[in-house]
């Protein structure tokens, strides 16, 4: 069995990597990938904590987090597809410009 600290450290490292990808990248697709990594890191923390205390709540929260990530990915990818059709660019700087 993996100790609680090792699992939580791994989850924290994954969360920081996802947050770094979200903050540094300017492409919306890579920002969406960073957000997915952050959601999976929090789900990993739920599973590790539930395993440590012998509760099934961690697995239930993992299923909830995975369904949330799937819904977020499907909506996000649909929006990215429409944005790419209209602008031919997924750069966040060019998308945030207002036309008037």
Swiss-Prot record:
Pfam families, per the entry: Oxidored_q2 (PF00420)
Presence of keyword Lyase: no
Membrane topology: Multi-pass membrane protein
EC number: 7.1.1.-
Subunit comment: NDH-1 is composed of 13 different subunits. Subunits NuoA, H, J, K, L, M, N constitute the membrane sector of the complex.
Localization terms from the record: Cell inner membrane
Purpose of the protein: NDH-1 shuttles electrons from NADH, via FMN and iron-sulfur (Fe-S) centers, to quinones in the respiratory chain. The immediate electron acceptor for the enzyme in this species is believed to be ubiquinone. Couples the redox reaction to proton translocation (for every two electrons transferred, four hydrogen ions are translocated across the cytoplasmic membrane), and thus conserves the redox energy in a proton gradient.
Name this protein carries in UniProt: NADH-quinone oxidoreductase subunit K
Similarity comment text for this entry: Belongs to the complex I subunit 4L family.
Superkingdom per UniProt: Bacteria
HAMAP family in the cross-refs: NDH1_NuoK
Top EC group: translocase
């Amino acid at each position: 069995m993996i100790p609680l600290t090792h699992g939580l450290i791994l989850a924290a490292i994954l969360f920081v990597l996802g947050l770094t990808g979200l903050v540094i990248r300017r492409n919306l697709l890579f920002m969406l990938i960073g957000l997915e990594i952050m959601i999976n890191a929090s789900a990993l923390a739920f599973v590790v904590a539930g395993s440590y205390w012998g509760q099934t709540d961690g697995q239930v929260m993992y299923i909830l987090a995975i369904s949330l990530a799937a819904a977020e990915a499907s909506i996000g990818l649909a929006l990215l597809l429409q944005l790419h059709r209209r602008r031919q660019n997924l750069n966040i700087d060019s998308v945030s410009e207002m036309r008037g």
